[in-house]
């Protein structure tokens, strides 16, 4: 963990602190000049969530990993509950990181000195990476952000984040596969082994399977923050 001056809290080591700091300075140079406008309220609230949710996602994933390493596959219902709760928290907070960043970028882009996009109450409710990409396409200084949002929207990693979040939020837990054997030792258990559901694929892998999802998340946030700084242009 390391200290983040913007949030005044500790954040995971791989959180893009430097890119966030640069992005916030660039945004302030636009949104607070000559005075604080309505865009700042929406922007400030969303940017606070980026780091908070990233830390929460990382902490919940660490809880799952520690539980697996300490207890292995054969656990009681109470421990299974704790694991499923940790996965739910990981995916809910991880998706929130990206959605909060997207909302903050839309609020920034709505400023007359940036891209002057419409960001009324309806658009605030509808905001998503794909919609923001469409709203800013063709705007000056928005090329990098359009490219990063396009990469995000077509990413298989992002699809997995969304699908698992939605499954656990609205439909069911991820069904854990438990293997046994007759007349011999069961095959080695995997830390992550879940059956397919009506909306999610089967998953089987070791802990590094979801470690890589956090690597992707940190990299994506970094790219979005850099693109947001570019969007501010000469206002920096």
Predicted regions and their residues:
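Short N-terminal edge-element motif at the start of the domain
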Residues: 64-67
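Charged, low-complexity interaction regions
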Residues: 73-75
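Conserved helix-loop functional segments at active or binding sites
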Residues: 70
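Acidic, Ser/Thr/Gly/Pro-rich intrinsically disordered interaction regions
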Residues: 1-52, 56-59, 77-92, 100-236
